[in-house]
Amino acid sequence: MGMHAKKPGKILADLVSVLPDDQLMIGREASPSGNGSCHVFRMLVRVGYHETDGQRRVHHANYLNYFEKSRVEMLRAAGFDYRGFEKEGLMLVISELKIRYRGAAEFDDLLRISTWVTDVRGARIVHRHEVDREGELLVECDLVCGCIDERGRVRRLPKEWVKCFAPDRAENSYSQASRDGQGDT
């Protein structure tokens, strides 16, 4: 079906949409980082025993798997098909990653993974991921993906993605101007 499973942005048009299993949610809200508004995707993950290390805590590398799943599911919830994206000869590769571990998750914990786009333009898309357990922030991650073709050449992201995931730039500009003392008080 190409790059899109359904009409782009259809789900994002709703204030909050809950998918059938009540575990995946997406909606437009104030940016958790405080800059304007954006689409925030949330999913729940139960920590499996195989995801833990010798101390029964989630091995640090497994958070990357949670983030990957969250990014793919966010695309799906927004009406985009990553498999179709790859069939068109495009793919996303991680070019930059910054993680801060604030606490440890353990076997059988129920975690909420929150994902949103903080910037999207040209060939890059920047995601913010946060993991919390019952409101306690455990992990923060800023992740930059670049769009390339099968030969590794840089390619622009689909316009539909940019339009769908771009943070509310007007609101972001206003927020920045206010912090710089240039906006209305």
Predicted regions and their residues:
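N-terminal first-folded block
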Residues: 52-102
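HotDog/MaoC-like acyl-thioester-processing domains
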Residues: 2-43, 76, 106-110, 118-185
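Short, well-ordered beta-strand segments in beta-rich or mixed alpha/beta enzyme
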Residues: 45, 95-97, 142
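Hydrophobic aliphatic residue packing
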Residues: 47, 57-58, 93-94, 120, ...
